[in-house]
Amino acid sequence: MFRKLFKTFAIVLFLAGSFTGKVISSELTFFTIGTGGTAYTYYPVGGMIANAISKPPGSRECGKGGSCGVDGLIASAVSSRGSVDNVNAILSGLRNSGFAQSDVAYWAYTGTGTMKGKEPAKDLRTIAALFEEHIHL
């Protein structure tokens, strides 16, 4: 599990690197990550990702105890009711990103399953698979 989490952080940091550049203090970018309930796994993982990619103005330099994140980015993990809530929040513009189980993300992309009757979310993208999850009936 640690190996998958490490790979995820590496991917997120790589993707975040495309936003780098010097930032004037007035040029802040806020980035929200929809997670899950605060008592469950996804909320602290979202917090770790947010901390890894954030680098507000005035932060210590990377390598001197500071964040090596994206200059001017302030990311935050936001608790939610889970996958469907996160996908709906992304589609409405309330959140920038969020965790979703693969079946829910697929349904949103295709307009099927729990998202039947809604416009397919063809702009929805997967950044990484964090956990292997099995659904039991």
How should each PLM-predicted stretch be described?
Residues 1-10:
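Bacterial N-terminal signal peptides that target proteins for export
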Residues 10-19:
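Sec-dependent N-terminal signal peptides of Gram-positive bacterial secreted proteins and lipoproteins
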Residues 19-25:
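Sec/Tat signal peptide C-region and signal peptidase I cleavage site
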Residues 26-137:
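Short, glycine-/small- and polar/acidic-enriched structural segments
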